[in-house]
Each structure stands twice: as structure tokens, then as C-alpha cells.
């Protein structure tokens, strides 16, 4: 016998307000285990006989009663109940897929009943997850055969939810509001509830299932706004969701070709303001930004002009995040020059490639943070620069500036900043771009000789172009045509040689500047060998070891100063 008409929105509202009245409710919580199993079996048999049995008043009553008191059921009994709902829902979806479009509206109500039951069951199983979390064990600790855990069923549950989103369409309902209620409250809401549990996101099938359901809701059912709201709330209240939300948006862009939602989230985040008293939410938003820059740099580049305000945020976690974001964008642009070419307006007077302009701007903002008021931010800026030294691109001007700032940071009041500045100097030496022509050594004397030789050759080559007129040539100038006064045209080989000499001269000049900066830091590093901070001393020793190998002037002074430290260290190891 069919029951009264079922209105999904009303049932969900009553359930939310704890005012749901189940007609002829069965008090399953007062029954023994065998009677409870019989009640669930009645639902299982009815659904197995017909997927539309959920429209039968008695079957629907038993299903609701069993779900309401699922926390009182044995794990295996609860498992049977879940399987019955999933089986009936999946079977009805198969029937819907094979039904003519003109007759599908008749299946709307049973689908809504299944969706209502399933979202309620998910909510309560999650509430009582500790009861259904671990398989039963025997007295000896061995696992009992056939035991069930709620977490193990999640991939199947999410698979059915995804199937529902792929199968249903707007033709099922007479209004968009009814479809929105079905999708947002019966499909998306359980997914949002499940993702609040950090443990589930560590299980790949569950995590991918959550992402798939959310992406299908956005792609096929216009749930972008609801998902955007959910993401912002997740970042606000659940710190563990920072990276997963960025990964979700990446999956949505790559696998479902929907990039706009990620950009909308970034715009909303850019409009937020944080104070120095905020601690949790800026850290979560910052981690989200960093992960977005890793997975979706193009979207971040498009919104970077808005996000840039957080560079000067009162909250240091946001400043830290922007430093990492800029480092990641530099890396992305260096490896993929066409990534942001369309986002920079063309300048007719400047033929510098668009991606180089962006890289220069990001480096400028990044290096500014070496002087930040917060120790953590200064340290992060040095660390990011350290990572950028591994890029194949040379960035000679930025490397020189890094070296200057790293030497200045050797006198920072924070030992953390000093230690990372030393590590940056070591990395700058190990990855320096001045080994292509003359080998990797950085001897000031040798490079000065090379620079002088190149400069002499360059002056001789340029003298031909800039040779001044003699007095006799000046007197006869009026009688000679302008074309006759012009210097003789250079051959292509001479032009190529002149260009090569100029490049080599710049190359040698930059190398000398680099070595000069390093040598200015040597006396400070000698003093740091006497630091009380062990990590700082070890970093200084590593610097002098590397500097000595590269023949940097003054490195021998550091090596001599640290000999007693090596001896002390060896003795301490012997005593241990």
C-alpha cells in the first residue's frame, strides 16, 4: 500500500529540526538483536523484490525506524541495512537510465526517498563511527570473520552517490529548486560531513570518491556556488582541509574542465583581511594558497594582482604563504615560459618577454621579505631563495642580489635566519653559473686576470667604431660626403665576435661581483664559528669547506679557525 506523498524538502527540514514524525514507528532500540535483525531483513527482502518498494508505507516506516536507531544495531545488522539502501538506490538508478524520458517523472519520488534515507543513514553512521570503526576481535585478539567497519563501506557509498549525479537530470523534477534540494542536501551535504574527518582523506579511494562526487555536482548540476561556500567554510574551520580543497579544485580543472570555480575561490580569498591576532584561519588559507600555486599556477597567476595585498598582511602566516606562492610561480614561469604570457600587457618600448617581467616582479617582492619584521618570514624568504637556486635558469641579477642580502642576513639577530643565510650562500656557490667558460673555481685573482684580458680585447674592438676624427679629417669634412665618413661596415664574423666579447665581459663582471660579495661575508662567518648555536656552527663549517674547494679568497682563514672545532667534535665522539 502506498503511503502519503513524500516531500523531500519538508522531510529534510523536519529531520534537521529533530521534529521528524515516523508514522507507526517501530521502537527498534527496545528490541533484542534477533528482532532487530528481523526488522532489517524485512527491509532487505522488500527492496530485493522491487526497487520501488520504498514507496510502500510499511517498508518506508521500517527503513526509517531502523535508520533512526542504527546506533543500537549490531555492526553486521547495520551493514545489511546499508547494503539494502545502497542496492535499492542503485537498482532504481539503473531503471531510470533505461526508462523513456517521458516516463521518468514517476521515479522522482522513490529516488527522493532513497536519497533521504541514505543521507540520514550516512549522518548517523558517521555519528556512531566509533561503534562501527573497528572489526570485532576475539578474546585472543584475532579478527572475527565477517566483521564490518563503516569506513570500509565508504568507497561503495560514494560510488552510488556519484552514480546518482551522473544519472539524474532536470527532467525528473518540475522545478529547479526540487533538483537543487536533491543534489545539495542529499548528495553534497553527506560528502561535506565525511570530509570533516581527517582520517578519511588519508585513504585514497575515499578521498578520490569525495572529490568525484563534488566535481560531478559542479559539472552536471550547477552546484558551483554551494561548493565554493563549502570550501571557504572548510578553510575557515578545518585546518586539515587546506591542501585537499586545493587538490579538489585541481581535479575539477584537469579532469572536469572547470577552472572558474578555483578562480572564484581565489578572488574571495583575496578579498579577506587578517589581523595579527588571527592564527588558525590564516595558516589554513595560506596552506591552501601554496598548494594551489603548486597544482594550478595559471589560475593563481590570473588572480595574483588581487592576492598580492596579502604580501603586506598583518598576519605573518599569510606573508609566509605569499613568499612560497611567489617562489612557486617563479619556478612555474621559468620551466613553462608560456604559462603567464597572456596575463601581462604588451609594452611597445620593451621587448622583454612577458614571463621575464613577471619573474622579475616576483623576485623583487620576494627579496623584499629579507627585511621583514618577523623572524619566521625572513627565514622563509631565505629558504624559498635556496630552493630557486636549483632551477636551470641562471637569473644572474637576482643571484647577485640574493648573495648581497644573504651576507647582510649573516648579522641578523635571529640564529635561524643566520643559519639559513649560510645555507643559501653554500647553495649559491654550489650552483653558481660562472663555470661554463673557465671552470667552476672562484679565485678572485684568476677572474680578475680574465676580466682584464677580455676588457682589453673589447676596447680594441670598439675602438674601430668610436675612432675620433683628426684635424686634417675635420678640415676636409666639408668636402667629403656623409657616407664616406661612416666607419666601414663590420663583417658578420666581426659583429658576432664583438657581441661575444661584450657578453663575456658582462659574464666576468658579474662573477667578480659575486666573489666580492662572498668575500665580504667571510670575516662574519669566521666569527660565527664561535657561536653557541651548534647548527649555526655546523653550517659555517660547511660553508668554509665548500669555499675552500672553490678557492674563494679568505676561505683558508675559516678552515684554520675551525680546525679546533673538528678536533673537539672528534674527541666528543670518541668519549661517547
Stretches with model-predicted labels:
Residues 125-135, 164-172, 176, 503-561:
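Extended amphipathic secondary-structure runs
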Amino acid at each position: 500500500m502506498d503511503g502519503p506523498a513524500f516531500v523531500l524538502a519538508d522531510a529534510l527540514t523536519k529531520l534537521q529540526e529533530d521534529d521528524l514524525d515516523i508514522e507507526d514507528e517501530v521502537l527498534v532500540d527496545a528490541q533484542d538483536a534477533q528482532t532487530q535483525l528481523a526488522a532489517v531483513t524485512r527491509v532487505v527482502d522488500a527492496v530485493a523484490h522491487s526497487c520501488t518498494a520504498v514507496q510502500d508505507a510499511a517498508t518506508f516506516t521500517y527503513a526509517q525506524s531502523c535508520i533512526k536507531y542504527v546506533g543500537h544495531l549490531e555492526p553486521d545488522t547495520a551493514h545489511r541495512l546499508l547494503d539494502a539502501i545502497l542496492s535499492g538506490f542503485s537498482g532504481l538508478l539503473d531503471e531510470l537510465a533505461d526508462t523513456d524520458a517521458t516516463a521518468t517523472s514517476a521515479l522522482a519520488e522513490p529516488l527522493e526517498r532513497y536519497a533521504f534515507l541514505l543521507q540520514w543513514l550516512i549522518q548517523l553512521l558517521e555519528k556512531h563511527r566509533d561503534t562501527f570503526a573497528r572489526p570485532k576481535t576475539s578474546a585472543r585478539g584475532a579478527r572475527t570473520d565477517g566483521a564490518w567497519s563503516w569506513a570500509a563501506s565508504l568507497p561503495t557509498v560514494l560510488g552510488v552517490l556519484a552514480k546518482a549525479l551522473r544519472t539524474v537530470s532536470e527532467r525528473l523534477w518540475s522545478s529547479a529548486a526540487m533538483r537543487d534540494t536533491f543534489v545539495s542536501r542529499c548528495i553534497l551535504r553527506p560528502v561535506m560531513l565525511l570530509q570533516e574527518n581527517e582520517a578519511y582523506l588519508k585513504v585514497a579511494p575515499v578521498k578520490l570518491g569525495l572529490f568525484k562526487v563534488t566535481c560531478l555536482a559542479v559539472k552536471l548540476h550547477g552546484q558551483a556556488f554551494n561548493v565554493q561556500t563549502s570550501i571557504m567554510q572548510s578553510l575557515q574551520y578545518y585546518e586539515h582541509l587546506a591542501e585537499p580543497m586545493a587538490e579538489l579544485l585541481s581535479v575539477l580543472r584537469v579532469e572536469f574542465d572547470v577552472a572558474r570555480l578555483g578562480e572564484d575561490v581565489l578572488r574571495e580569498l583575496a578579498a579577506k583581511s587578517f589581523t595579527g591576532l588571527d592564527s588558525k584561519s590564516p595558516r589554513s588559507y595560506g596552506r591552501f594558497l601554496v598548494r594551489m600555486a603548486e597544482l594550478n599556477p595559471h589560475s593563481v597567476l590570473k588572480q595574483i594582482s588581487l592576492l598580492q595585498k596579502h604580501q603586506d598582511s598583518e598576519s605573518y602566516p599569510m606573508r609566509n604563504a605569499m613568499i612560497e606562492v611567489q617562489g612557486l610561480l617563479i619556478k612555474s614561469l621559468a620551466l613553462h615560459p608560456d604559462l603567464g604570457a597572456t596575463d601581462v600587457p604588451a609594452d611597445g618600448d620593451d621587448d622583454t618577454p612577458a614571463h621575464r617581467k613577471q619573474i622579475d616582479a616576483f623576485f623583487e617582492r620576494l627579496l623584499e621579505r629579507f627585511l621583514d619584521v618577523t623572524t619566521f618570514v625572513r627565514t622563509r624568504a631565505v629558504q624559498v631563495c635556496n630552493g630557486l637556486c636549483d632551477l636551470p635558469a641562471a637569473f644572474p641579477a637576482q643571484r647577485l642580489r640574493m648573495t648581497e642580502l644573504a651576507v647582510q642576513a649573516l648579522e641578523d639577530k635571529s640564529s635561524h635566519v643566520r643559519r639559513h643565510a649560510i645555507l643559501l650562500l653554500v647553495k649559491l656557490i654550489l650552483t653558481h653559473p660562472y663555470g661554463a667558460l673557465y671552470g667552476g673555481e672562484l679565485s678572485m685573482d684568476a677572474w680578475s686576470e680574465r676580466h682584464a684580458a677580455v676588457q682589453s680585447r673589447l676596447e680594441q674592438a670598439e675602438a674601430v667604431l668610436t675612432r675620433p676624427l683628426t684635424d686634417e679629417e675635420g678640415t676636409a669634412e666639408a668636402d667629403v660626403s656623409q657616407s664616406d665618413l661612416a666607419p666601414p661596415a663590420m663583417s658578420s664574423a666581426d659583429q658576432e665576435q664583438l657581441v661575444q666579447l661584450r657578453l663575456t665581459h658582462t659574464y666576468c663582471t658579474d662573477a667578480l661581483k659575486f666573489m666580492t660579495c662572498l668575500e665580504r661575508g667571510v670575516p662574519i662567518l669566521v666569527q660565527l664559528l664561535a657561536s653557541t648555536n651548534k647548527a649555526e656552527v655546523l653550517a659555517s663549517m660547511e660553508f668554509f669547506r665548500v669555499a675552500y674547494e672553490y678557492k674563494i679568497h679568505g676561505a683558508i682563514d675559516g678552515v684554520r679557525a675551525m680546525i679546533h672545532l673538528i678536533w673537539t667534535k672528534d674527541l666528543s665522539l670518541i668519549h661517547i
